[in-house]
UniProtKB/Swiss-Prot annotation:
Protein name: Ribosomal protein uS12 methylthiotransferase RimO
InterPro entries reported for this sequence: Elp3/MiaA/NifB-like_rSAM, Methylthiotransferase, Methylthiotransferase_CS, Methylthiotransferase_N, Methylthiotransferase_N_sf, NA-bd_OB-fold, Ribosomal_uS12_MeSTrfase_RimO, rSAM
Top EC group: transferase
Keywords from the UniProt entry: 4Fe-4S, Cytoplasm, Iron, Iron-sulfur, Metal-binding, S-adenosyl-L-methionine, Transferase
């Protein structure tokens, strides 16, 4: 009589990089014969992959851990908040194990201790697909090219959680991308803590892919990915000089004309306190140059308002910079002190909460007007759209200007499409964030 199949529940919180970590753990568990189940009550054990970037993320992680304990009782914690084991056990002393980010083997071992794999299990090739277990829809996938970060931004604790930059060999990255494309993926989203720095730690060493030499560097990686016939989107790009090298690839249609660059602020004084590159005037000139080379370029960014020491003058400088930059997609966060962040030791005057809220609201209104005007320019134009979902009201997709989850949507008036379809549409209407379209 065979033993029952061990069942694992999994909750993945935080950023796409954490999602990729979850996929890796789940792939290993599936290879060992575990079944992944969608409910707490059906699971023999629950793994919670946490986020610990800001206080609100930690609070969410603790809440989900508590929910899993209440509903199941057997909980293993991993991920970025796992580096603060005391903070987790102080609130939830009954968790079975706590591991940090990238500690895949420790997570799997902890699962083994709670519910061992089936001894008679013999992994078959068809049990786990070649691309591994994916938590995204079939038509797009995140491609993580490195771990860690060499920056020391004063508001951030990522290096203390995920360590210094460690780039994956370019041959491994490209082989994974090939497997994803063969499995039906039509959009690869390149992610890391710092995509522009890819290969710095390896001194851009030459690796091999399909028998051909390829340097472990962002430009060469992008050139190789562009040969796979799918959308390639770059995230978490720092505005180093080497970013200039990929703009011509975008202009030539080899990469999506999309850059996700976290500028964080524009005031030189605030950028210096943040320990960020403080060349906002040169950045504006570079944005102008990029758009001259690639007029279709979409730039997404994130900003922080209310950083300690930020004055009304600094904030107004940021608004004026946004007017000049005319960014397409923008997110904004109110500064939240993070335990262990160097910013706590700067001795700068904290910005009152009500002032942070006021600046956030003004920032969002300011950028909303910019976004609405830029999207209005697309009305009447034809673009390609990748369909994400279809319901009774029509299809919802994204253009090259829209990353999943964080950017806008294109609503297509058609009930004949399915997720993963790429279609050509004509834009008929726009608001502050989204577009409406009809099939061409």
């Amino acid at each position: 009589m065979s033993t029952p199949t061990p069942k694992v529940g999994f909750v993945s919180l935080g950023c796409p990089k954490a999602l990729v970590d979850s996929e890796r753990i789940l792939t290993q568990l599936r290879m060992e014969g575990y079944e992944v189940v969608p409910t707490y009550e059906d699971a023999d054990v629950v793994v919670v992959n946490t986020c610990g970037f800001i206080d609100s993320a930690k609070a969410e992680s603790l809440e989900v851990i508590g929910e899993a304990i209440a509903e199941n009782g057997k909980v293993i914690v991993t991920g970025c908040m796992g580096v603060e084991e005391h903070a987790i056990r102080d609130v939830h002393p009954s968790v079975l194990a706590v591991t940090g980010p990238q500690q895949y083997e420790q997570v799997v071992t902890a699962v083994h201790e709670v519910v061992p794999p089936k001894t008679e299990h013999n992994p078959l090739v068809d049990l786990v697909p070649p691309q591994g277990v994916k938590l995204t829809p079939r038509h797009y996938a995140y491609l993580k090219i490195s771990e860690g970060c060499n920056h020391s931004c004063s508001f951030c604790i990522i290096p203390s959680m995920r360590g210094k930059l460690v780039s994956r060999p370019v041959g491994d990255v490209l082989s994974e991308a090939e497997r994803l494309v063969k499995a039906g993926v039509k959009e690869l989203l390149v992610i890391s803590q710092d995509t522009s720095a890819y290969g710095v730690d390896l001194k851009y060493k030459t690796d091999f892919w399909n028998g051909q030499p390829v340097k472990t560097r962002m430009k060469e990686l992008c050139e190789a990915l562009s040969s796979m016939g799918v959308w390639v989107r770059l995230h978490y790009v720092y505005p180093y000089p080497n970013v200039d090298d990929v703009i011509p690839l975008m202009a030539a249609g080899k990469l999506l004309p999309y850059l996700d660059i976290p500028f964080q602020h524009a005031s030189p004084k605030v950028l210096k306190a943040m320990k960020r590159p403080a060349f906002e005037d040169k950045t504006l000139a570079r944005i102008k140059q990029w758009r001259e080379i690639c007029p279709e370029l979409t730039i997404r960014s994130t900003f922080i308002v209310g950083f300690p020491g930020e004055t009304e003058e600094d904030f107004q400088y940021l608004l004026d910079w946004l007017t000049e930059a005319q960014l397409d997609r923008v997110g904004c966060f109110q500064y939240s002190p993070v335990e262990g962040a160097p910013a706590n030791e700067l001795g700068l005057e904290p910005v009152p909460d009500e002032v942070k809220q006021d600046r956030w609201e003004r920032f969002m209104a300011h950028q909303q007007a910019i976004s609405a005007a830029r999207l209005q320019l697309k009305v009447g134009k034809e673009i390609e759209v990748l369909i994400d979902e279809v319901d009774e009201q029509g299809a919802v997709g994204r253009s090259w200007a829209d990353a999943p989850e964080i950017d806008g949507n294109v609503f297509v008036d058609s009930d004949e499409l399915k997720p993963g379809d790429k279609v050509r549409v004509r834009i008929t209407d726009a608001d502050e964030y989204d577009l409406w379209a009809e099939l061409v």
